[in-house]
């Protein structure tokens, strides 16, 4: 996703009009493989594609429950498939733009030139933007702490109206913490459809069914027992001050 968003930015900048751009993707990007949710105070470049916007939120913890306005901000949900389609429709046939479906085997960076070894051959460039994430360097060190923000989410459709579509449940900490930081996150699309995520901040990940048990337990506690799971998603975001930028070179930039 970051590579396609970078392509959009480059192709909308006149400076790169005559630059040749090669995009290498292992898989064709045309599905909802991720969901972005973000704050914005004004109209943004993706407003025509957002699934939902909210201007109110709810926060819960043990013995605490309050609603608040987000003004002047809005919280926005954006699904990836519509972004992929928009960028590919606008830029896949653009002049000096080439898409290659291939697996990247190795990236060899020298100061002024980077070589990319793929399943379809080798390529060289004076400037490479790399969105592949290799956690080994981050995990094989002790200087910078690493905390994981990890989650599993369900897009569900309930049999009965169950959600207030005007506000997000930004965080509900009123669940068993088990000596960690755990919360539920709920984005209601309408009265019957919502994204429900079970999220943790912790050192270690859980087995997949442990996240799903957390979602089921939460829905049961709210009296929501009849629903259809439309989609599932899973994510893990490292929270660290590890200096990734130190791996950049003159010809290779990690994004």
Regions found by a protein language model. Name each.
Residues 5-64:
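N-terminal FAD cofactor-binding segment of flavoenzymes
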Residues 40-102, 106-112:
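A conserved beta-strand/loop capping segment in the N-terminal third of enzymes
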Residues 244-255:
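Conserved mid-domain beta->alpha element of the FAD-binding
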Residues 230-232:
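An accessory alpha-helical subdomain
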Residues 9-13, 93-228, 240-245:
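Predominantly flavin-linked oxidoreductase catalytic cores and closely associated redox partners
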């Amino acid at each position: 996703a970051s590579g396609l968003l970078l392509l959009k930015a480059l192709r909308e900048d006149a400076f790169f009009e005559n630059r040749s751009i090669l995009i290498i993707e292992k898989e064709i990007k045309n599905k909802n493989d991720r969901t972005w949710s973000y704050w914005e105070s004004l109209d943004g470049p993706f407003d025509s594609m957002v699934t939902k916007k909210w201007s109110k939120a709810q926060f819960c913890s043990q013995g605490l429950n309050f609603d608040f306005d987000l003004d002047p901000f809005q919280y926005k949900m954006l699904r990836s498939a519509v972004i992929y389609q928009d960028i590919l429709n606008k830029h896949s046939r653009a002049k000096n733009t080439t898409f290659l479906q291939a697996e990247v085997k190795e990236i060899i960076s020298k100061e002024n030139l980077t070589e990319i070894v793929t399943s379809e051959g080798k390529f060289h460039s004076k400037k490479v933007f790399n969105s592949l994430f290799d956690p080994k360097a981050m995990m094989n060190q002790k200087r910078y702490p690493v905390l994981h923000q990890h989650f599993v989410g369900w897009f569900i459709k309930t049999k009965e109206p169950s959600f207030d579509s005007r506000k997000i449940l930004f965080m509900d900490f009123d669940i068993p913490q088990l000596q960690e930081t755990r919360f539920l996150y709920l984005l209601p699309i309408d009265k019957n459809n919502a994204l429900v995520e079970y999220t943790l901040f912790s050192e270690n990940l859980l087995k997949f069914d442990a996240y799903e048990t957390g979602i089921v337990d939460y829905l049961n506690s709210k009296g929501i027992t009849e629903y259809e799971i439309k989609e599932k998603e899973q994510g893990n975001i490292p929270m660290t001050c590890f200096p990734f930028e130190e791996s950049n070179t003159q010809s290779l930039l990690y994004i």
